[in-house]
Amino acid sequence: MEQSKKTSFDFYMLPLVLAVAVVPLLTMMTSYSSGIGKYTWASGGSFVDFFLGFKRGALILLGAVIIILFCAAQWMRVQAKAVWTTKNQKIVLILLAVFGGVTAISALLADEKIDALFGGFEQMEGLLVVTAYVALFCLAYFLLSSENKIQVIVHALLIGSLILSVLGALQAFGVDYLANDVTTPFFTMFMHALPKKFNGITASFGKGVSYATLYNPNYVGSYVALVLPLTIYEAVQDEKNRYKIVAAASAVCQLIMLKGSGSLAGMVGVGAAVCVAVLFLFSDIYKNRKILCGVFVVAVGLVALFLWKNPTFFRSVIKGNGEPCSSHISSMISDGTSVKITLHSGKMITLRWDADATVYEFEALNENGKKIEMTGDSFSGVKLKGDAYQGLLFEATKRQITYQEQKTYFDVLRLTVDDKYSWDFAMLGVGLRYINGVGKPDMLHYVESFGMEGRYDFASNRGYIWSRTFPLLKRALLLGVGQDNFAYAFPNDDYVGKVNCGFNEQIVTKPHNMYLQIWVQDGLPALLAFLALYLLLFGRTIRKCFKKGKWNHSQKISLAFLCGVSGYFVAGLANDSSICVAPVFWILFGVAFAVLRSE
C-alpha cells in the first residue's frame, strides 16, 4: 500500500464519506405506499416510515453519482482497468459481478417488480440500493490506493460512529433525542398530514433500549460488530491524538449502546471478531503474549458475566422450550365447506357446514368421522363434550369484513381457544372463509415447513421463521424471488403458526438470517459469490499478516478490517442485511480489499 504523504481530500471520496458517516444517521418521518395491501394477510398499502426512506434516497443518489463518475472520468476508468487486468484482483471483480448480476436478474423477474427495484415494505433495500452497495465497494476498491486516503474514510467512520453511538448510549440511559416533543417538529417537517391520533414520535422498543438511528436494536448489534474492531484499533494506533480520543469515546459508547440494545447476535459478532484477532496474534505468540493474556481474561470475564445474567441460555439454545406452539391448536385447513382442526394433543376435529347453511349451523366430527356431542347454542356459547376438547368455545357474533372491496358487517362464528385466541369464520358468496386479523376473508391451508420442530421459540422465535424459510430455498437454486420480495414468498398466510409463535398479524418481511435472505431473494449463486468474497479476504489477510518480520501498519489495519467484517458476517447468522448498516459494511469490505491490493 502506498505511503503517500498527501492529505488533501479528493472529490471522488465524497460519496464514500457520506455513505459511511452520514447515511446511517438519516432519519425523517415520511409517508409512502406499497402494493402489499392487495394481499389478504396485509391490512393496507399506506404506511409511515421514520428510519429507512431518507437512507434509501441518499444511497440511490450516491450510487448514481458514482456510476456517472466512472462513465465520465477517464482516469477512473483507467484505474478500474488496471485493477481488472491484474490477475490476483480480477477474481474479486468476477465474484462481485456474479453477486450483482444474479441479484439484478432475480429482481427484474420478480413478481413484485416495484418492490424489487425500489424497495419494499419495512425494508426499502431494492435493486437500486444494492447497485449502490456494489458501486460503493468498487469505488473504495479501485481508488483508495494510499494509506492516507484510506485514513480519510476511517476518520469519517469514527466521527459518524461517535455521533450514532452517543445517541444509542443516551437511549440506554433513557434519554432519547429522536422521540421527544422538542425534536418531533423537525422530524415531521416533510409530512403533509400527520396520522390520526398522532401523539408524537415514540419508540416501540421501550425506554432504555438502544436503537440509535438504525431502526431496530438488532441492527445495533450488526453495526457494533462491524465497526468496533476498527474503532478500537484507531484508538490505539491512530497517529493523531484527536482521532484517538474520538475513537476511544466511540468505542465506549458503542459498548454501552450494544448493552442497551440487548442484541445477542451483536455480542456474538463482537466475540467472533475477538477470536479472529486472537488467531492472527498467534502468528507471533511470544511478542503478543501480554495482549493475548489480556484478551483471554476479558473474554472469559464477558462470557462469565453473560452466563450469569442468562443462566438458561444453553438449555434454550439446545432444547428450546420444548413446545412447538403455544396454542391449543396446531393447524387448521379449510376447503370452503369444512375446517379440519388438529389440536396440540394430536386429536383432530372437522367442522362441517351444508352448502345452504348459515355459519352458525355446523357439526363437529372426530378423526373417525363420528359426530362430537355439543352443549349450549351459538349465541350463549357452544362447547364440545369430552376432555380432549376442553378450552374450545364457539360463539355467534358480527364483524366488519373487507369483502369485494367494501367493508360490511357479516354474521361470524367465533372459535375462542383457551380464552386467549379467537378464530372467526363467515359464510360468504364464495363459501366458508376464515376472517383474519385484518378483517379479510381467506382460506386456511397446509403450510410446508422443515426443521426446528419443538424449537420454534429459538432465538426470539427465529426457529419458526427459519422452519418456514427452509422450504423456499429449493426454488432459489439459480435465481431468487427478487430483492424485498421475501414477504411475498414467505407464508404470511400461515395464520395458525404465526399466532402460536406470537407474530399474530405481523408481516414477516425478512428471515432474520442474512444468508437465507440472500439465497431466497437473490439466488444461491449470489450467496456463494458473497461467501467466496469473504473467504478470499480471509485467505489474503492470512497471507499478508503471517509474513515473518515486524508487523507494519498495513498488516495491522488489514487485521482490523477483517475482524470487523468477520463480526458482521457472524452477526448475520441472526440478523439480516439492512439499509441502515449495509452501506457501511460494503464500503469497509471494499476498503479491506483495497488495503490488500499491494500484495
Name every feature range the model reports, one short phrase each:
Residues S31-S43, Y177-F190, G480, F490:
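Interfacial/capping segments of alpha-helical transmembrane domains
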Residues L117-L127:
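Non-cytosolic membrane-interface motifs at loop->transmembrane helix junctions
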Residues M1-Q3, S598-E599:
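Short, charged juxtamembrane terminal tails flanking transmembrane helices
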Residues F121, L255-L258, S449-R455, W551-N552:
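Glycine- and acidic
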Residues M76-Q79, L596-E599:
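Membrane-interface capping segments at transmembrane-helix boundaries
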Residues E2-M29, G57-Q74, K90-K113, G126-Q404, ...:
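Alpha-helical transmembrane segments of multi-pass inner-membrane proteins
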Residues A140, N216, D354, V359-E363, ...:
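TM-adjacent membrane-interface loops and short helices in multi-pass inner/ER membrane proteins
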Residues S34-G53, K113-A116, K196-T213, Y464, ...:
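Juxtamembrane membrane-water interface segments that cap and precede transmembrane helices
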